[in-house]
Design a protein with these regions (language model features):
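Contiguous mid-protein beta-loop-alpha structural module that forms a pocket-lining wall or clamp
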Residues: 1-40
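Proline- and acidic/polar-enriched loop/turn elements at helix boundaries
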Residues: 4, 48-50
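Acidic/polar loop patches that form or flank catalytic/metal-binding clefts of enzymes
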Residues: 36, 46, 99-101
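Phosphate/ribose-recognition catalytic cores of enzymes acting on nucleotide-derived substrates
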Residues: 50-204
Length: 204
């Protein structure tokens, strides 16, 4: 079950009615700041963390059996064609007392087999740049998290093999860290810093 801010037709501004088409256009263009201004908070996706192939934890791991690579949170998306897609710098709420910075892929994972365990469905796959030690490798499954999409890094890319995919994810992590280290990130993170359960179904 995925939930996210629902735009209401009308005027713009926090707490006021906004154009849902304007929000969709901003998301499609990768203008996450524009979408956040219209919604009054960063665009977010919420849901239960589900099991996937567990491929991420093997990519970039310190050893073959370590499982300490790019551990990811998988959320199935309700729509086949979400307004936003690509790779994003994100904040994850619900795993610890403070939101966790991360990098996320929202889309169909073109580098992997579309007939895998997820059946080619749209997924939000999020790698937290820091992982809470008390969760352990399996502790996030079943938890409800909210992932705020703050900044689009680039569109989805198709990599030639797992080595290229691993290098691409590593670069995305570095770019996300650079984003969070910049003053630019403060504008969006200040909009919404407290965990709040969303009850509005995503219509965007």
């Amino acid at each position: 079950e995925i939930s996210a801010p629902q735009a209401r037709p009308g005027s713009s501004g926090p707490g006021l009615r906004v154009s849902s088409s304007a929000v969709r256009q901003a998301l499609a263009a990768g203008d996450m700041q524009g979408a956040a201004r219209l919604l009054g908070r960063p665009y977010a996706i919420s849901g239960h963390v589900v099991h996937g192939r567990k491929l991420g934890r093997a990519l970039g791991a310190s050893s073959a059996e370590a499982g300490d690579g790019f551990r990811t949170l998988n959320l199935r998306f309700a729509h086949w064609k979400p307004a936003a897609s690509g790779i994003f710098a994100v904040l994850v709420h619900g795993l610890s007392n403070a939101p966790l910075p991360g990098v996320a892929n929202l889309g169909v994972r073109p580098s992997l087999n579309p007939h895998d365990v997820n059946g080619g469905r749209v997924l939000l796959e999020t790698h937290c740049l820091t992982w809470p030690a008390d969760l352990g490798p399996e502790g996030a499954y079943g938890k409800i998290v909210r992932v705020e999409l703050l900044h689009k890094l680039h569109d989805e890319l198709k990599y030639d093999g797992l080595d290229a995919l691993t290098a691409g994810i590593a670069k995305d992590c570095a770019d996300a860290r650079a984003y969070f280290a910049s003053a630019h990130a403060l504008t969006l993170t200040s909009l919404h810093t407290e965990t709040r359960r969303q009850t509005t179904r995503d219509r965007i």
